[in-house]
């Protein structure tokens, strides 16, 4: 028997409950994994609220990523062995004691590393790494502005950006200014400063790259912060949430603003707009521009490369071993406290990763 978290209907943290049921059996090409650590992220809050693109209908189990140990192989599995430690980007389903997942979607994890620490690499640091290197294709010396710089993805971007030799700028609250500056970025107080005016005062009148994980009207202003040749990467839609629940007004505003900035990208001969979703690269599909002037290609087109996620994960492991990145684990909570983890997430009561330990 095993336990898992279930969302019976969309809503706030109060909709989460624990159920007990028989262990799952892996199907063809699947492995069953005993979960050692499962992450809690804002994407989980969006899944729970019903505002995530492609969210399944309830009931379902949240949980975007996991670290675990292979317990059983389904028919046709050849790469992994029982006892192997693996990480996986599940999108949903990780908040359980045991999970069946495709063998092809699991990446090997060294056994000597802390599972909760490595969990940061599966989603948070992977997102940051691919935003910089797979999507924006940054070069040393370029200026990069990241919104929400004190958040989980934001701090990962700043760490990886420093390794890449970038000039970094980050929007944050006054309370988080010192934390952002410690990571080597110029902090911009989004409540009291106009970030567009700040970066357009720089030599070159703007930044080379803006990373926008909020979306909505912010994306329109972010486009204006680009210098000629600049790239805007939109990778989230947290503006569609209000108090932890789906906001229809937020959705309407997000789609209107995103459509507007996409049109600007299509019409601009000198600036590009990209949309990034980590599943696109996990599932071997290159992210291409929404618009970059004449001949722009649609998102999701382009060549397939089945090794990108695995290659990038290995690069992150090397940086972790070299002590060049420092993932933070905010709290480790038992699976039974999933509701509390979501409450902490929405209160912004923690800096670092919230981890469930089944």
Located regions from the model:
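Mid-domain Rossmann-like dinucleotide-binding core that forms the NAD(H)/NADP(H) cofactor-binding site
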Residues: 126-193
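Short helix-loop-beta connector
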Residues: 81, 111-114, 137-143
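A glycine-/small-residue-rich N-terminal strand-loop-strand element
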Residues: 67-91
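A structural motif shared across PLP-dependent enzymes of the aminotransferase-like
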Residues: 90-103
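C-terminal capping/lid region of NAD(P)-dependent oxidoreductase domains
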Residues: 298, 317-332, 339-358
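Short amphipathic alpha-helix with an adjacent loop that forms part of the alpha/beta core around
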Residues: 194-204
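N-terminal glycine-rich beta->alpha transition that marks the start or flank
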Residues: 11-15, 21-67
């Amino acid at each position: 028997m095993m336990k898992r978290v279930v969302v019976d209907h969309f809503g706030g943290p109060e909709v989460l409950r624990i159920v007990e049921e028989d262990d799952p059996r892996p199907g063809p090409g699947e492995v069953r994994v005993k979960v050692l650590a499962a992450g809690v992220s804002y994407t989980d809050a969006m899944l729970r609220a019903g505002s995530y693109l492609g969210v399944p209908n309830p009931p379902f189990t949240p949980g975007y990523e996991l670290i675990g140990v292979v317990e059983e192989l389904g028919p046709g599995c050849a790469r992994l062995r029982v006892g192997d430690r693996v990480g996986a980007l599940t999108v949903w389903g990780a908040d359980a004691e045991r999970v069946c997942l495709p063998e092809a979607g699991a990446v090997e994890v060294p056994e000597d590393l802390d599972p909760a620490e490595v969990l940061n690499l599966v989603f948070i640091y992977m997102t940051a790494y691919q935003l910089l290197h797979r999507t924006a294709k940054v070069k040393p010396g370029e200026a990069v502005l990241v919104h929400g710089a004190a958040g989980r993805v934001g701090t990962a971007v700043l760490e990886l950006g420093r390794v890449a030799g970038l000039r970094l700028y980050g929007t944050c609250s006054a309370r988080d200014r010192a934390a952002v500056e410690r990571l080597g970025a110029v902090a911009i107080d989004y409540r009291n400063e106009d970030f567009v005016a700040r970066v357009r005062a720089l030599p070159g009148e703007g930044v080379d790259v803006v990373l926008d994980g909020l979306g909505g009207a912010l994306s329109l202003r972010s486009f204006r912060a680009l210098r000629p040749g600049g790239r805007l990467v939109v990778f989230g839609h947290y503006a569609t949430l209000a108090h932890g629940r789906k906001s229809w007004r937020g959705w309407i505003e997000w789609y209107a603003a995103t459509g507007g900035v996409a049109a600007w990208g299509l019409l601009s001969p000198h600036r590009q707009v990209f949309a990034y979703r980590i599943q696109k690269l996990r599932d071997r599909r290159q992210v291409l521009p929404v618009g970059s002037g004449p001949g722009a290609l649609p998102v999701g087109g382009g060549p397939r490369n089945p090794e990108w996620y695995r290659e990038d994960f290995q690069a992150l492991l090397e940086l972790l071993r070299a002590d060049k990145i420092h993932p933070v684990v905010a709290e480790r909570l038992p699976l039974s406290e999933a509701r509390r983890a979501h409450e902490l997430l929405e209160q912004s009561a923690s800096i670092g990763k919230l981890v469930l330990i089944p």
